[in-house]
Amino acid sequence: MSDNNQATSNASVLTGRVVSDKMDKSITVLIERLVRHPLYGKQLRRSTKIKAHDENNVCQQGDLVRIKETRPISKTKSWTLVDVVEKVEKI
């Protein structure tokens, strides 16, 4: 028998752009995906806004972030920040 000490996670991980960071310890992430139209075959851009938990308030509006699904944190939050992929420059 092999001893596997690492816990495997089935939680889904998504990448998106932060559109709002005005809440304390929370961010709103815009997730975009491409969907093919069933009849015409054209690729359509669909988007979803997801609220995620940002414990240390490290994200700014415009950052590219990776989030993962977790237990429900509040009524609308069940995602948490994994890491910031790309920081936006402040002018």
From Swiss-Prot:
The biological processes this protein is annotated with in GO are: translation
What is one term from the GO cellular component aspect held by the record? cytosolic small ribosomal subunit
UniProt KW keywords: Ribonucleoprotein, Ribosomal protein, RNA-binding, rRNA-binding
- Do you know which InterPro entries this protein is assigned to? NA-bd_OB-fold, Ribosomal_uS17, Ribosomal_uS17_bact/chlr, Ribosomal_uS17_CS
Q: Which domain of life is it from?
A: Bacteria
Q: Name one Pfam family in it.
A: Ribosomal_S17
- Keyword Glycoprotein carried by entry: no
Q: Which GO terms describe its molecular function?
A: rRNA binding; structural constituent of ribosome
Quaternary context:
Part of the 30S ribosomal subunit.
Q: Which family does it belong to?
A: Belongs to the universal ribosomal protein uS17 family.
**NCBIfam families hit by this protein:** PRK05610.1 (NF004123), uS17_bact (TIGR03635)
User: Which PANTHER family does the annotation name?
Assistant: 40S RIBOSOMAL PROTEIN S11 FAMILY MEMBER (PTHR10744), SMALL RIBOSOMAL SUBUNIT PROTEIN US17M (PTHR10744:SF1)
Name the job this protein performs.
Answer: One of the primary rRNA binding proteins, it binds specifically to the 5'-end of 16S ribosomal RNA.
Mind telling me what this protein is named?
Answer: Small ribosomal subunit protein uS17
Instruction: Give the organism, scientific name.
Output: Psychrobacter arcticus (strain DSM 17307 / VKM B-2377 / 273-4)
